[in-house]
């Protein structure tokens, strides 16, 4: 992904150079976007996996986290339940609110993922982040 940084005619942004050392050049990468608006920030993580070196230090107001598939952390399969994985990711990111994506049977032949245990873990008193559900084609207020 970042193999051409050294050959770039202009000096790359420092953040891009820093990310070069924090991820694998061989696993296809993680699809994630941090959207920053005047009302707040939102991390959209489209894969059930992340690299600590990239996510560490991000503090999104809202996190949209994938719970589908086999999660991995730092390129290695996560050892534990999907609830354990989600709680570890939420502890690292410390978002104010969390919703889940890529858990439904969107494509025929692929089963959905039961998100109720993960949602319940965020709905207990004292949870580090609040859970909110999203429905198809239904607007959701993201920021309070």
Where are these regions (language model features)?
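Active-site/binding-pocket entry motifs
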Residues: 1, 69-70
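Core dinuclear metal-dependent hydrolase active-site scaffold
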Residues: 1-57, 78, 141-144
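A sequence-composition feature that detects small, non-aromatic residues
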Residues: 3, 7-8, 13-18, 32, ...
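Active-site metal-binding loops of divalent metal-dependent hydrolases
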Residues: 47-48, 67-69, 103-104
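Binuclear metal-ion centers of metallo-dependent hydrolases, dominated by the metallo-beta-lactamase
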Residues: 56-58, 73-75, 83-144
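Active-site metal-binding motif and surrounding structural segment of the metallo-beta-lactamase
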Residues: 59-66
């Amino acid at each position: 992904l970042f193999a051409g940084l050294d050959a770039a005619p202009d000096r790359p942004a420092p953040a891009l150079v820093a990310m070069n050392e924090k991820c694998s050049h061989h696993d296809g990468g993680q699809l994630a976007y941090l959207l920053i608006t005047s009302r707040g920030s939102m991390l959209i993580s489209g894969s059930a996996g992340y690299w600590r070196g990239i996510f560490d230090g991000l503090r999104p107001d809202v996190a949209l986290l994938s719970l589908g598939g086999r999660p991995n952390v730092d390129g290695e399969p996560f050892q534990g339940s999907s609830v354990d994985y989600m709680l570890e990711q939420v502890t690292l990111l410390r978002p104010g609110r969390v919703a889940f994506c890529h858990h439904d049977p969107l494509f025929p032949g692929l089963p959905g993922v039961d998100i109720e245990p993960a949602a319940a873990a965020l709905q207990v008193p004292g949870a580090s982040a609040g859970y909110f559900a999203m429905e198809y084609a239904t607007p959701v207020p993201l920021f309070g």
